[in-house]
Amino acid sequence: MLLLRRYSGGSLYSILPIRASIESTIRHFNSLEPLQSSDSTPTKGDYFAAINHVVNIVRREIHPERSLNSLRLPVTSEFVFRVLRATSRSSNDSLRFFNWARSNPSYTPTSMEYEELAKSLASHKKYESMWKILKQMKDLSLDISGETLCFIIEQYGKNGHVDQAVELFNGVPKTLGCQQTVDVYNSLLHALCDVKMFHGAYALIRRMIRKGLKPDKRTYAILVNGWCSAGKMKEAQEFLDEMSRRGFNPPARGRDLLIEGLLNAGYLESAKEMVSKMTKGGFVPDIQTFNILIEAISKSGEVEFCIEMYYTACKLGLCVDIDTYKTLIPAVSKIGKIDEAFRLLNNCVEDGHKPFPSLYAPIIKGMCRNGMFDDAFSFFSDMKVKAHPPNRPVYTMLITMCGRGGKFVDAANYLVEMTEMGLVPISRCFDMVTDGLKNGGKHDLAMRIEQLEVQLRGV
């Protein structure tokens, strides 16, 4: 039996499975009645379980309307929005559910649901249905947000329909009653750059300036990224120089925009060369560009270059942040440079950051890989006191590394310690530890670990 209960103070509904399994929920929905009892308080998880059941009906059933009608669910704005968002990967399912919801006399759609559906239809190239939804919004005097408008324009450009993007942009004030803001200009600029119409993009910026709007960082970044992706570095530099001469200096320095543009276009060597020239001249990128650069370079395997650039930038006065260390410490630990990882961690602490598990876990893993288990255990003990508490992934990693190194007694100790902290180990950890202990002749300890698993899982 299933009970459908209403939240006492709002419009949320939840499904509480009592005896039936989750898989049989749909079959039993037709016998549900909304109850007004307030003797128990359903949880937020129950509410989302109800949404999940409705989503499954919409996705899987050939005629979902009949099943939805049999549920006799109170249809609310938030409920419809969440179902639309969950079914956004299938615009036909979303549209069908929305049409069913609109047929409910107690439901009055808001712009939130309309816009979610319009974005889903636009992303799946269902432009005719999308325009019908937008017309319904206008007929109901519902405003279309700038975010939705920008999304549709960019989707047109992404799919190569730049003429429709320009038409929508030009008709924004009259057709949809929206303003041509900087964000809307940026979206059309993005659409033009997607199809390599750089002359049109540059003309759009000139029009933007004539209208009295000031380009922001994204305006510059879109055009620079587009030019860089087409291999037009010279044009990107000339554009930035011209905008500076006109008095429209970008919020970020031109060289930073060029570096990010090269990275986004995949020209890693050119970006490295530009940064090297900057540092030799005594200049450094801003911290955001620097972090993007070292992340891209470290992924390519050139960790030594990242370390060298880090120390050079620090000498030139760059104030690194926690994101810098989140990139560098795992990278140097992965290639076995444990001493360098410790130096970076000490610098992180001196900068006032309390180490997160994502910072010290890679060092522990690197030490275990090098066979430095005693040092790793000692360092882990220090981190439990001086840093943020270890989480489940850290313990799982440490237990796994102990198992690979044959340290099954230590792995068992960390398994018990993990449970004492309220963290539930995964089944693989239990299996690995018990098998290792049995193979090593420690059957009593293996039995205690098995009993611990039974207590935790109730199996």
From Swiss-Prot:
GO terms for biological process: RNA splicing. It is found in: Mitochondrion. Keywords: Mitochondrion, Repeat, Transit peptide. GO terms for cellular component: mitochondrion. It comes from the Eukaryota. Residues 1-7 form a transit peptide. PPR repeats lie at residues 110-144, 145-175, 181-215, 216-250, 251-285, 286-320, 321-355, 356-390, 391-425. The keyword Mitochondrion applies. The keyword Nucleotide-binding does not apply. Belongs to the PPR family. P subfamily. This is Pentatricopeptide repeat-containing protein At5g18390, mitochondrial. It comes from Arabidopsis thaliana.
